[in-house]
């Protein structure tokens, strides 16, 4: 019997790659950030997921919890889907947190 975790790995990896593309679309250098998606809480008998975007040294990060698997499964490279909206909503908070902590990646400092 296949392990459900193994079946989810390509889905989560694709969504992470899409998040990196969305960072680039928001004028952020994706090589300056780390994107991670992992299982979170169980709500109504279903596992939800956590999206975390942080600077490479993890000094600054933002996260969204309670993301349904369906949002992750349907994430696309062009954006415009529910997952893309979540990423787009996290970007301003990420930038604000970097500015307030004076932790600005090199590419943004130029």
Model-derived segments and their meaning:
Residues 26-66:
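Amphipathic alpha-helical interaction modules
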Residues 1-41, 78-85, 110:
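Negatively charged, low-complexity tracts enriched in Asp/Glu with abundant Ser/Thr
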Residues 4-6, 94-110:
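Short, charged, intrinsically disordered terminal tails
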Residues 52-89:
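Intrinsically disordered, low-complexity regulatory segments enriched in Ser/Thr/Pro
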Residues 40, 45, 66, 76-80, ...:
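Residue-identity detector for glycine
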Residues 19, 83, 87, 91-94, ...:
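Generic structural signal of hydrophobic/aromatic residues within well-ordered alpha-helices
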């Amino acid at each position: 019997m296949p392990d459900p975790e193994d079946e989810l790995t390509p889905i989560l990896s694709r969504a992470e790659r899409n998040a990196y593309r969305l960072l680039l679309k928001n004028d952020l250098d994706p090589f300056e950030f780390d994107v991670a998606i992992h299982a979170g809480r169980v709500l109504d008998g279903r596992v939800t997921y956590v999206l975390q975007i942080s600077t490479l040294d993890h000094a600054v990060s933002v996260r969204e919890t309670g993301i349904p698997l369906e949002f992750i499964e349907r994430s696309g490279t062009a954006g415009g889907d529910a997952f893309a909206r979540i990423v787009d909503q996290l970007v301003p908070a990420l930038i604000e947190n970097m500015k307030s902590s004076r932790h600005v990646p090199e590419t943004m400092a130029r």
